Amino acid sequence: MRLNAQLASLLLSSIVLVGSAHGADEEPVAEKKEASSIERPTFVPTTIKAPFVEQFTDKWDSRWSVSHAKKEDAKSDEEWAYVGEWSVEEPTVFKGIEGDKGLVVKNPAAHHAISAKFPKKIDNKGKTLVVQYEVKLQNSLSCGGAYMKLLQENKKLHSEEFSNASPYVIMFGPDRCGATNKVHFIFKHKNPKTGEYEEKHLKAPPAIKVTKLTSLYTLIVNPDQTFQIRIDGEPLKNGTLLEDFTPPVNPPKEIDDEKDTKPADWVDEEKIPDPEAKKPEDWDEDAPFEIVDTEATKPADWLDDEPTTIPDPEAVKPEDWDDEEDGDWIAPTVPNPKCEEGSGCGKWEPPMIRNPAYKGKWSAPLIDNPAYKGVWAPRKIPNPNYFEDKTPSNFEPMGAIGFEIWTMQNDILFDNIYIGHSIEDAEKFKAETYDIKRPIEEAEEEASKPKLSPQIDDETDISFTQDPIGYVRAKIDRFISLAQDDPIAALQAVPEVGGAIGAILASLLIIIGMFGLSSPAPPAKSTGKTAEKTEKEKTTEAVTASGADSGQGEAKKRAAKSG
């Protein structure tokens, strides 16, 4: 216990020293620029034309409609309403272009829905489809969606509020929560035989970009059924609608015949025991697995006459032990220390070793079964539901765009939406918007990082011998400043502080361990009448603790003992 107290005192002194070093002369160790000197261009609306281009300019609310419908959920009896609010505003984090506004999700942990109808329905038959838009995660994204839906053109689209039940043709964009981290690309395909729609999900979609800077998501679907997904202009996924989606667009030509059954004489066994094999004459199935090691010899320091356990020499008979009532007191036993000093105590017996003659149960070796017919499978028949759609890129006509999302983070900003048929125009639109704002945002991000003051610069002239407190404070300040942006880099740049933290944690673990080891051993378990007496005392204590008269409780105790 004295050692524990010393360790605790030493640890406390270390913590106080570190704290005082960091707290003394509190001066700002990091300085941020009061105002950014980075020049930003002023927003100018694009002149690019397409079936749908949106930059959230004036009168945006005449084009977009916020939904307050009830969200349908067949898996739950609860009703969810789209209560999330939307706003069109400039970015509040790393602004790139002056006056450039976007559509912003305003509420965390809420369902949001908003949509805008196209001036004309978009028919993609025989054309290239290009879907492109910016996403800015101003508050990062740990759990939520930022994807869009291109809604199917139909009568309901013009008569009902937008919700999760609104039929869509394409769903595209980032989604992240828990193990999910992907850029969705889902399209609905109409079965030409049944008329039913089925979702086709992209296999192995790319991961999203989690950054507070603007990210640009682009989907290109070509009339040859190939597609490409780009993030920030970089192609990250290429494939084909006919091969890279599940379930596949086209069903198999043939299917298993459900009425076919395996013949009764069908042989499934590929291997059989060799009928001509015979057990060797010297094969002893009864030989034991282990035998006594006849070559083993008793160690010279083996103590034959010493017992393995002895009465605990430190045990003391309890003061209230009554030999007449409780019987003879017997001290508890402990391992004999003499046995631990030598090879062992008591009667010595040679150890067991594996029997070299052991072979176990004999069985014939396996050989190829001459009657084996292979793995049975039902015969194939033509699929009555088979069809072949060679052009799934001829999507159903689309009449609107919608964002229907749930997110734990607010301030997700959408901007510069392009939906059309020209890759060239989409790239020009990117050059006018994303390519201008992204470098500015990167510069803003860099400028916002803490600027180290001279007192914590690596080139400081402070030495530990000259000023121990100042030296420690400088190291801690530098570590904290760097750790705010990159903990790993902080550990690499200032390993002394990381080592000190590790030492403190190790000391805590040692103290906890020593407290555990120094705790008193549990009392020896009473037997016989002692156990009965203990139970009687517990009963008496319970009566006293319950608030009963103390004198009456003592009388009960004496009566129990005399009985």
Curated annotation (Swiss-Prot):
<keyword id="KW-0020">Allergen</keyword>
<keyword id="KW-0256">Endoplasmic reticulum</keyword>
<feature type="binding site">
    <location>
        <position position="168"/>
    </location>
    <ligand>
        <name>an alpha-D-glucoside</name>
    </ligand>
</feature>
<feature type="topological domain" description="Cytoplasmic">
    <location>
        <begin position="518"/>
        <end position="563"/>
    </location>
</feature>
<dbReference type="InterPro" id="IPR018124">
    <property type="entry name" value="Calret/calnex_CS"/>
</dbReference>
<comment type="similarity">
    <text>Belongs to the calreticulin family.</text>
</comment>
<feature type="disulfide bond">
    <location>
        <begin position="143"/>
        <end position="177"/>
    </location>
</feature>
<dbReference type="InterPro" id="IPR009033">
    <property type="entry name" value="Calreticulin/calnexin_P_dom_sf"/>
</dbReference>
<feature type="glycosylation site" description="N-linked (GlcNAc...) asparagine">
    <location>
        <position position="238"/>
    </location>
</feature>
<keyword id="KW-1015">Disulfide bond</keyword>
<feature type="binding site">
    <location>
        <position position="404"/>
    </location>
    <ligand>
        <name>an alpha-D-glucoside</name>
    </ligand>
</feature>
<feature type="binding site">
    <location>
        <position position="147"/>
    </location>
    <ligand>
        <name>an alpha-D-glucoside</name>
    </ligand>
</feature>
<dbReference type="Pfam" id="PF00262">
    <property type="entry name" value="Calreticulin"/>
</dbReference>
<feature type="binding site">
    <location>
        <position position="415"/>
    </location>
    <ligand>
        <name>Ca(2+)</name>
    </ligand>
</feature>
<dbReference type="InterPro" id="IPR013320">
    <property type="entry name" value="ConA-like_dom_sf"/>
</dbReference>
<dbReference type="GO" id="GO:0005789">
    <property type="term" value="C:endoplasmic reticulum membrane"/>
</dbReference>
<feature type="topological domain" description="Lumenal">
    <location>
        <begin position="24"/>
        <end position="496"/>
    </location>
</feature>
<feature type="signal peptide">
    <location>
        <begin position="1"/>
        <end position="23"/>
    </location>
</feature>
<keyword id="KW-0812">Transmembrane</keyword>
<feature type="compositionally biased region" description="Basic and acidic residues">
    <location>
        <begin position="530"/>
        <end position="540"/>
    </location>
</feature>
<feature type="region of interest" description="Disordered">
    <location>
        <begin position="297"/>
        <end position="325"/>
    </location>
</feature>
<feature type="region of interest" description="Disordered">
    <location>
        <begin position="521"/>
        <end position="563"/>
    </location>
</feature>
<feature type="binding site">
    <location>
        <position position="100"/>
    </location>
    <ligand>
        <name>Ca(2+)</name>
    </ligand>
</feature>
<keyword id="KW-0472">Membrane</keyword>
<dbReference type="GO" id="GO:0051082">
    <property type="term" value="F:unfolded protein binding"/>
</dbReference>
<keyword id="KW-0106">Calcium</keyword>
<feature type="binding site">
    <location>
        <position position="175"/>
    </location>
    <ligand>
        <name>an alpha-D-glucoside</name>
    </ligand>
</feature>
<dbReference type="InterPro" id="IPR001580">
    <property type="entry name" value="Calret/calnex"/>
</dbReference>
<keyword id="KW-0479">Metal-binding</keyword>
<keyword id="KW-0143">Chaperone</keyword>
<feature type="region of interest" description="Disordered">
    <location>
        <begin position="240"/>
        <end position="282"/>
    </location>
</feature>
<protein>
    <recommendedName>
        <fullName>Calnexin homolog ARB_00147</fullName>
    </recommendedName>
</protein>
<dbReference type="GO" id="GO:0005509">
    <property type="term" value="F:calcium ion binding"/>
</dbReference>
<keyword id="KW-1133">Transmembrane helix</keyword>
<comment type="function">
    <text>Calcium-binding protein that interacts with newly synthesized monoglucosylated glycoproteins in the endoplasmic reticulum. It may act in assisting protein assembly and/or in the retention within the ER of unassembled protein subunits. It seems to play a major role in the quality control apparatus of the ER by the retention of incorrectly folded proteins.</text>
</comment>
<keyword id="KW-0325">Glycoprotein</keyword>
<feature type="transmembrane region" description="Helical">
    <location>
        <begin position="497"/>
        <end position="517"/>
    </location>
</feature>
<feature type="compositionally biased region" description="Basic and acidic residues">
    <location>
        <begin position="253"/>
        <end position="281"/>
    </location>
</feature>
<dbReference type="GO" id="GO:0006457">
    <property type="term" value="P:protein folding"/>
</dbReference>
<dbReference type="GO" id="GO:0036503">
    <property type="term" value="P:ERAD pathway"/>
</dbReference>
<keyword id="KW-0732">Signal</keyword>
<feature type="binding site">
    <location>
        <position position="149"/>
    </location>
    <ligand>
        <name>an alpha-D-glucoside</name>
    </ligand>
</feature>
